[in-house]
Amino acid sequence: ALPIFPARNLVTVEDPVEYQVAGITQIAAKPEIGLDFANGLRAILRQSPDVIMVGEIRDFETADIAIKASLTGQMVLSTLHTNDSVGAITRLVNMGVEPFLVSSSLVMACAQRLLKRICPNCKEEFDIPGPLLEKIRSEYPEARDVTKFYRGRGCAHCSGTGYRGRLAVLETLLVDDEIRDMVTKQRSELDIRSYLQKKGVRNLRDNAMIKFITGWTSLEEVYRAT
């Protein structure tokens, strides 16, 4: 297979390496021999990478190295265990990273949930109770002209569940100057979410609801996952 970005040096440290990707140097973390994410990241930095992917930031040491690498010009991608995109900021600070370092290095945080997809073989229309329909239409302009809403009935193709496959719903936080200032001043998650809401940035629930309105998933699944 041809490399995805032939002119760039892309290096990862993963635990484990699940897929081999052409053109990317992939390092498997092995904590039992001392090759954890932090040590793997140190080794990567000696290879003059353009892009670094760290499988997961689990501790201060890994977070500190990753953030300092990003401040020297490398693009750094990683994952954190948080409930939403704003929670990534709090998680890094709680690990011990100085807020000013988080604000100066973080460019974007993206939260993801998986929704069950309605089975296409038993997809059927159903009626939403009037008050709930009015609430949805008042909150989501996309629903105002929609007259058909769907769910899965259950069939042999989906083992009677009404669902077949999954789809991702995302919440993306693009860090602007206002958010950087809020992070540096250690403003609360609630303050940041309030600012994003005023900007019209949609959260996980909003984006999941759009998947329901457009017929991809069920209302029950929206409430379950978000």
Residue spans of the language-model regions?
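Short, flexible helix-loop junctions that flank or precede catalytic/ligand sites
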Residues: 1-226
